[in-house]
UniProtKB/Swiss-Prot annotation:
Signal peptide: none
Enzyme class of the recorded protein, top EC level: hydrolase
Example GO biological process: dGTP catabolic process
Species this protein is from: Escherichia coli O9:H4 (strain HS)
EC assignment: 3.1.5.1
Xref: CDD domains: HDc (cd00077)
Catalytic activity: dGTP + H2O = 2'-deoxyguanosine + triphosphate + H(+)
Entry superkingdom: Bacteria
Keyword Magnesium (UniProt): yes
Protein name: Deoxyguanosinetriphosphate triphosphohydrolase
Cofactor(s) the protein needs: Mg(2+)
């Protein structure tokens, strides 16, 4: 196992800046303060205020959006980071681990990773993801790319259909089809930060949001040693070279994770579990009393002094005894949140320290709060009650189905841009309006300038005389559409769909 030295991981250099010499502690902290400013002032963060947490298109400002959720995750991440650093200081290990002059950057990277962790999520959350992937899967049929004979290939895009005698090109076709059918919010977050918004963050800060290490074009089983880390796609083919450079800059082995990402993940797990239940009470899906009984029933028999007793029962009893000063709802969730944090944050911090050799190497194949402990059981309790009584509620399911339809419908509306031939689409990009393509011209004008420029830049770097050019061009054209639609807020997607379907009120 390599020696633990965080100076080798907290890399404060940037992709688009020439290498700099040795910096003082204050100068390094200023570099990460610059990251904070870039992130907090970015449009991607502002858009989170109109993206779904659990309840799409919610008008009640007391119910969480992705932005308010991310701010809560940021606070919990800071708490865990400080707890880790405090414990390492008590153990006199800060200097040994190269952290004595990097405590500020350590905290800042965790905080900003937490704030950014959802920026790649499309409108309507996981149902938006599913809509994008299903729509592309129905047209590209990535499963047919493994089939024999090649005549069984149902891919509707001629450039991406497998052909006899073109094995090197066929392998690229397989990768592209697989990649486009695995849109994922975390992978889109990497693309946003690097390719679309050109935020030019430090290598360490970007490493903090690389939650999953599986390429989106991966086919087959994942290695048992990395099955958790590769649970979902973490980056796209379009960012392959950038991630390879990121791994080099952060001393990460293939499919390994940046150490501070485990803290961001734990902060997210702690935050959303309680928040989803609180939002459900705010939405009157159930009362606080009903929630307590759901939790009690799901946990089962317990003794005085058990974690359930110390966290949930304690919150319930205190909220009932102090009901004159504040509402029972407010009291209950205040105590539940405080009790949960007071138990889970120290536990997550100690798990991080206990497993630091594997975490530093990037190979710890678990979440900090997923083990056989009571703390893990408490998180599972919150999640299970939310799944059973919140996510399955008819109002929630109806909104999710509407969201799925909106995203599918928008993709269908913009499909003419994907149906154009390479030469016709190239003409449209160059002229912006082509008389014989009136619909396509108007659809193209609606695309964001940022996304169009990203497409143009990517295609301009390709050798136009290469047999791979038509494949890559179509890939980036699909990315253009995915970038545009996934970047919409819930409300904008809803309004855009209604406008283009001519059903605006």
């Amino acid at each position: 196992m390599a020696q633990i030295d965080f100076r080798k991981k907290i890399n404060w250099h940037r992709r688009y800046r020439s290498p700099q010499g040795v910096k003082t502690e204050h100068e390094i902290l200023r570099i990460f303060e610059s990251d904070r400013g870039r992130i907090i002032n970015s449009p991607a963060i502002r858009r989170l205020q109109q993206k779904t947490q659990v309840f799409p298109l919610e008008r009640n400002a007391a119910v969480r959006t992705r932005l308010t959720h991310s701010m809560e995750v940021q606070q919990v991440g800071r708490y865990i980071a400080k707890e880790i650093l405090s414990r390492l200081k008590e153990l006199k290990l800060l200097e040994a681990y190269g952290l004595d002059e990097l405590t500020g950057p350590f905290e800042s990277i965790v905080e900003m990773s937490c704030l950014m962790h959802d920026i790649g999520n499309p409108p309507f959350g996981h149902f938006g993801e599913a809509a994008i992937n299903d729509w592309f899967r129905q047209r590209l049929h990535p499963e047919d790319a493994e089939s024999q004979p090649l005549t069984d290939d149902r891919c509707s895009v001629a450039a991406l259909r497998l052909r006899d005698g073109e094995e090197p090109l066929n392998e690229l076709r397989r990768k592209i089809r697989q990649d486009l059918c695995h849109f994922e919010g975390n992978a889109q977050g990497i693309r946003l930060v690097h390719t679309l918004m050109r935020m030019n963050l430090t290598w360490a800060q970007v490493g903090g949001i690389l939650k999953y290490t599986r390429p989106a074009w991966w086919r087959g089983e994942t290695p048992e040693t990395h099955h958790y880390l590769m649970k979902k796609p973490g980056y796209y083919l379009s960012e392959e070279a950038y991630i390879a450079r990121l791994r080099k800059e952060l001393n990460l082995a293939l499919y390994s994770r940046f150490p501070l990402t485990w803290i961001m993940e734990a902060a997210d797990d702690i935050s959303y579990c309680v928040a989803d239940l609180e939002d459900a009470v705010e939405k009157r899906i159930f009362t606080v009393e009903q929630l307590y009984h759901h939790l009690h029933e799901a946990w089962g028999q317990h003794e005085k002094g058990s974690l359930f007793s110390l966290v949930v029962e304690n919150a319930w009893e205190k909220s009932r005894s102090n009901s004159l000063s504040r509402s029972t709802e407010d009291q209950f969730f205040m105590y539940l949140r405080v009790n949960t944090l007071n138990k889970l944050v120290p536990y997550a911090a100690q798990r991080f320290i206990d497993n630091l050799p594997a975490i530093f190497a990037g190979t710890f194949n678990h979440a900090l709060l997923e083990d056989a402990s009571e703390c893990s059981d408490l998180l599972k309790l919150y999640k299970n009650v939310a799944v059973k009584h919140v996510f399955s509620h008819p109002d929630v399911e109806q909104l999710e189905l509407q969201g799925y339809r909106v995203i599918s419908g928008l993709l269908e509306i913009y499909r003419p841009l994907l149906s154009l031939s390479l030469s016709d689409f190239t003409e449209l990009v160059e002229k912006e309006r082509v008389k014989r393509f009136p619909i396509e011209s108007r659809l193209f004008h609606k695309l964001s300038t940022r996304h169009r420029l990203a497409y143009v830049e990517a295609v301009s770097k390709l050798p136009s005389d290469s047999p791979e050019f038509p494949l890559w061009e179509y890939y980036y054209r699909c990315r253009l559409l995915q970038d545009y639609i996934s970047g919409m807020t819930d409300l904008y997607a809803w309004d855009e769909y209604r406008r283009l379907m001519a059903v605006e009120q």
